[in-house]
A protein has these predicted regions:
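Cytosolic nucleotide-utilizing catalytic cores of signal-transduction proteins
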Residues: 1-132
Length: 132
């Protein structure tokens, strides 16, 4: 566990910046994202292209909803300074685009990892700057 913490805590802090404490699953998730980034597999590249082609506010909504809050629409809205109905609208738009509901497993597994890799590549943008 010590080795996991020492190697992947910085990545976990980048991927999950609003967490105060990290458990073993968080660190293993960070390790998986870090490995995906280093291996640059075709799935990672495909997902990064999909995320890059989306509007910035939709990607930020996904990260807030899936990574920063426990899939809580109201908390995601508070984090992004938008109304919860805006979050619902954006998630519906994303669902239509991807063909599945974000957060529902197992369909969302690759999406979670892609968002983690996205944060490792680009850091954590300040959601307060997003607006509508």
């Amino acid at each position: 566990l010590y080795q996991l913490v020492s190697q992947y805590l910085p990545a976990a802090r980048t991927i999950l910046p609003y967490r105060l404490f990290f458990n073993q699953a968080d660190l293993e998730f960070a390790r998986g994202c870090q490995r995906e980034l280093q291996e640059e597999g075709t799935e990672v590249i495909r997902w990064q292209k999909r995320l890059d082609s989306m509007q910035h506010n939709l990607v930020e909504t996904l990260m807030a909803f899936l990574l920063d809050t426990p899939q809580n629409i109201e908390q995601a809205g508070d984090l992004l300074y938008v109304h919860r109905n805006t979050i619902k609208y954006r998630l519906n738009k994303i669902s239509n685009r991807f063909g599945f509901v974000p957060g529902v497993m197992p369909e969302s597994f690759e999406l979670y990892q892609a968002l983690g890799v996205h944060r490792l590549l680009r850091g954590n943008d300040d959601p307060g700057e997003l607006g509508e």
